[in-house]
């Protein structure tokens, strides 16, 4: 509500390990910003749900002044959402966008009923983003922009607390083959039909050229990567978008720093030697996103 009224968004950053969490929280403290730490099913498979929740609980103890949510990103079933709700997540996303409208409504309602009974909020998705990221993969030909009228009906039928819509972003590092595009008219229409309601943008990494170039400079092959320009995301945040998801930029920032460190220090075999600059790269990148993209600096 505060973000909607203030015409800014809150950054939702995907986490997989300790260094990412530490970097994000340090940046949030510096910029005095709320933050959403989100774990995908892939992160749960990689680190284990108990480890992810445990690390974030420690972060909450270290940064009690920072409003922080622990969110499930792209939960693919009621069972996954239930496990996360029971395991300590404060927010979950059920992604039923691959299903028919009716089936998406049915399962989302089940998740909402269970979550709300436990004091947990629910994000849902209507429309399909193209791209590949983690366990989510959608061909461009199967991408579907969100219908504003259906969005309003969906929220009314399900009672979900926020809605991820498709207006031109996509998952992964290769978002556009042509010029970047966001359908602001569609977003505005959704906002008119759902006043004072938080909209979510997935696939919103900028794919920062500095990190792409550094990855390639030090042995990587990240070729043809293109993201969403920052000014386009900022405009969306001034409209109805209250949550902006960022994953790929974290991956690129960390990988660029690790590649550079290993290249410049070939004698080092201590993981801390390259994970420390990776953590610092995350901190700097998140600081920039908070201030220049989502606009949530100094809102606590």
Task: Label the predicted regions.
Residues 1-2, 17-43, 50-65, 74-198, ...:
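Alpha/beta enzyme core
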Residues 217, 222, 228-300:
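C-terminal alpha-helical cap/extension of soluble enzyme domains
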């Amino acid at each position: 509500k505060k973000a909607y009224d203030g015409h800014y968004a809150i950054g939702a950053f995907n986490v997989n390990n300790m260094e990412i969490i530490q970097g994000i929280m340090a940046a949030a403290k510096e910029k005095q910003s709320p933050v959403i730490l989100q774990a995908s099913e892939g992160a749960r498979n990689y680190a284990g749900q108990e480890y992810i929740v445990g690390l974030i609980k420690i972060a909450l103890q270290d940064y009690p002044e920072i409003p922080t949510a622990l969110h499930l990103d792209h939960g693919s079933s009621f069972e996954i959402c239930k496990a996360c709700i029971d395991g300590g997540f404060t927010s979950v996303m059920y992604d039923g966008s691959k299903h028919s409208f009716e089936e998406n409504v049915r399962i989302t309602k089940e998740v909402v009923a269970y979550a709300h009974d436990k004091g947990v909020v629910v994000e849902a998705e209507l429309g399909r983003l193209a791209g590949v990221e983690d366990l989510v993969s959608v061909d461009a030909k199967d991408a579907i922009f969100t219908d504003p009228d259906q969005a309003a009906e969906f929220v009314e039928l399900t009672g979900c607390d926020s809605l991820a819509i498709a207006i031109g972003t996509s998952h992964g590092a290769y978002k556009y083959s042509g010029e970047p595009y966001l359908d602001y008219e569609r977003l505005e229409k959704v906002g008119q039909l759902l006043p004072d309601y938080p909209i979510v943008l997935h696939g919103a990494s900028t794919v920062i050229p500095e990190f792409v170039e550094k990855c390639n400079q030090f042995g990587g092959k990240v070729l043809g990567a293109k993201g969403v320009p920052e000014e386009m995301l900022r405009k969306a945040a001034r409209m109805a978008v209250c949550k902006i998801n960022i994953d790929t930029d974290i991956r690129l920032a960390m990988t660029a720093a690790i590649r550079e460190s290993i290249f410049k220090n070939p004698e080092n075999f201590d993981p801390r030697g390259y994970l420390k600059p990776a953590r610092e790269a995350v901190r700097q990148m998140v600081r920039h996103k908070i201030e220049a993209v989502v606009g949530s600096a100094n809102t606590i």
